[in-house]
Amino acid sequence: VTMVLEETLNKANMTMDEIDAIAVTYAPGLLGSLLVGVEFAKTLSFVYKKPLIAVNHIAGHIYANNLEKPMQFPLLALVVSGGHTDLILMKGDYEFEHIGGTLDDAIGECYDKVARVIGLGYPGGPKVEKAALEGEHTYDLPIPMNDDSFNMSFSGLKSSIINLVHNEKQRGNEVRNNDLARSFQDVAVDQLCRKTELAIKKY
C-alpha cells in the first residue's frame, strides 16, 4: 500500500503536506482489504495530522459522477462492479434506497468465471467484451429473471455457460469463444438494461 501511495503522489506531483484530508473505504468489500486500507489510512491521518473521512464503497461509485457534472435528484444509480450489482434510488443527497440487485453472483464475478471457462483469462470484463465484438449471438442461453421485479440473477447464466462448454468438449465439438462471449454478454447486459428501465418507469 505504501508503494501505491508513493506512486500516486509522484504522478500527481504532490506531497502529503498538500493533501487536505484522507478518505478511506470502510464497507462493503472483502474484510481483509478493508482492514488493511482502514489501518493504513488511520496511520496516515495520525502521522500527518489530516482529517479522516470514512467512505461507503457504493456511495463512492455513485458520487464519482459528480466529477463530470453535478448530480440531480431524484436519481437512479445502477452500480456494477466485480462484487456488486445494485439498483439504488436516491431522492436526495446521501439518501440511499436499495430497490433491487443481484440475488446471487455479481455480474463482474460472472464475467470473470465465463472468461476463465472459455480460456480468455483475467480480468474477465475487458476480455469478454473484446471477444464479443468479434462474435455473433449464435448460442441460445437462458434469460434470467424475466419478471417485473428489480432483482437480477447471474448464477444460472454462469452455470449454463459452464455446462455448455463441458458438453461441447465431451462431444468433441469446438467452442466458438467469440460467439459464446457475444451471446453471454448480450444476455447479461440485457438483464441490466431491462431491470434499470423497469425501475425508471416506476420511479
Regions found by a protein language model. Give the residues of each.
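Glycine-rich phosphate-binding loop plus the immediately following alpha-helix
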Residues: G92-E134, K158-S159, N163-N167
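Short beta-strand-loop/turn "lid" adjacent to the catalytic site in phosphate-handling enzymes
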Residues: E6-K42, F46
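A contiguous, well-structured pocket-lining segment that forms one wall/lid of small-molecule binding clefts
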Residues: K130-Y203
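Short, well-ordered amphipathic alpha-helical segments that serve as non-catalytic structural scaffolds
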Residues: V1-A12, Q191-K195
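Conserved phosphate-binding catalytic cores of ATP/NTP-utilizing and phosphoryl-transfer enzymes
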Residues: A54-L76
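General beta-strand structural signal in soluble alpha/beta enzymes
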Residues: V24, L52-H57, G124
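Short beta-strand scaffold segments in enzyme catalytic cores
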Residues: A77, T85-L89
